[in-house]
């Protein structure tokens, strides 16, 4: 094989078990985790991303055993503090603000408080603040910029 040719290890694996969100931790560990571990194994440069929109607090200790895990999705329904207890600084926590709160009633001050809370809960961990799964900006697209400014400032105060 040509040494310059890309390999699977050069890519990112997107691991998700959204269809298994209704499974409890025991069934998840028995039925889903083994195939996720096999899927993640070839990504030897630690380029595995785990995504789950549901609350993953109870499953995170199981997911933490994925080989080559580098990035973990912390949805608005998951606890940032629980993710930090599970992963520490071993992965980047992709921490998501709740888009419904941002676009349907939040003031700049509300956004700031929410972001500062997320940052404080993530003390000691590498984080990436995100606002995604946006289905409507409620006629206020400028809020995207406001949220981004507040997120940058919250991160800078860290």
Feature-to-residue mapping (PLM):
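Active-site loop segments of alpha/beta catalytic cores
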Residues: 1-158
């Amino acid at each position: 094989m040509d040494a310059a040719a890309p390999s699977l290890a050069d890519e990112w694996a997107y691991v998700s078990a959204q269809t298994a969100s209704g499974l409890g931790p025991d069934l998840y560990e028995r039925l889903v985790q083994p195939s996720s571990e096999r899927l993640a194994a070839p990504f030897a440069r630690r380029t595995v991303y785990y995504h789950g929109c549901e609350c993953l607090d109870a499953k995170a200790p199981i997911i933490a055993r994925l080989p080559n895990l580098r990035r973990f999705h912390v949805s608005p329904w998951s606890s940032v503090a629980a993710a930090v207890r599970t992963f520490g600084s071993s992965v980047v926590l992709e921490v998501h603000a709740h888009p419904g709160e941002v676009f349907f009633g939040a003031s700049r001050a509300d956004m700031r408080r929410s972001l500062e809370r997320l940052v404080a809960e993530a003390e000691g961990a590498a984080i990436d603040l995100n606002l995604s799964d946006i289905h409507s900006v409620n006629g206020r697209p400028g809020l995207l910029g406001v949220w981004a400014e507040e997120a940058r400032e919250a991160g800078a105060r860290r």
